[in-house]
Design a protein with these regions (language model features):
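A short, N-terminal "cap"/entry segment at the start of jelly-roll beta-barrel domains
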Residues: 1-68
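Double-stranded beta-helix
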Residues: 117-150
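Extracellular structured ligand-interaction cores
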Residues: 73, 83, 111
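Long, positively charged binding patches that form subdomain-scale interaction surfaces
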Residues: 54-61, 71, 78-80, 88
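Residue-level marker of regulatory loop/turn positions in helix-turn-helix DNA-binding domains and
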Residues: 68-71, 116
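Conserved metal-binding segment of the jelly-roll/cupin
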Residues: 99-119, 127-128
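A short beta-strand-loop-beta hairpin characteristic of the jelly-roll/cupin
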Residues: 76-101
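General beta-strand recognition
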Residues: 85-87, 113, 123
Length: 150
């Protein structure tokens, strides 16, 4: 189950929802059909990829998906195995989410970054045409050190 921590004095899950982020826990090997059909249109529901994200090498923690970015698509991703860490930009500061097997991440337009803590297998789905990728655009936000845990 996703472990979420963030700036004190706010309802972090409510703030995540306001910026387009939601997590649910659904043990199994894929996101629940009800979630997929709620978020993606019929022609977008196919699995785009199954990937294993490896922890970054020392000094590369802020490169690629480890850089603050916004994806051009709406994402519905399922974690099959492993642990990883995400951070999301909220108006009150960054919040940290540690994710593991069974977590479903739904993101639409939120600024975030991702770091696998161990090899982590993902089932990737997102909006857009069949040939579309995530359309990641780095935001240039300062790459502060990653927290040790959520």
């Amino acid at each position: 189950m996703a472990m979420i921590s963030g700036p004190e004095g706010i309802d972090v899950e409510a703030q995540l929802a306001l910026v387009g982020v939601r997590f649910i826990h659904a043990p199994g090997d894929d996101a629940p059909e009800a979630v997929i059909t709620e978020v993606l249109s019929p022609d977008e529901r196919q699995i785009r990829a199954v990937v294993v994200a490896e922890p970054p090498l020392a000094g590369e923690e802020h490169a690629g998906m480890g850089a603050w970015h916004i994806n051009a698509v709406t994402e519905v991703h399922f974690v099959r195995s492993g642990r990883g860490m995400l951070q999301f930009a909220l108006p009150q500061g960054a919040c940290t989410v540690e994710i593991s097997a069974g977590d479903v991440m739904i993101v639409s337009g939120a600024e975030h970054r991702y770091r696998p803590l161990e090899p982590q297998e993902w089932v990737i789905r997102h909006s857009g045409p069949a040939e579309a990728d995530l359309g990641a655009r780095e935001t240039g936000r300062d790459p502060a050190p990653w927290p040790s845990s959520a």
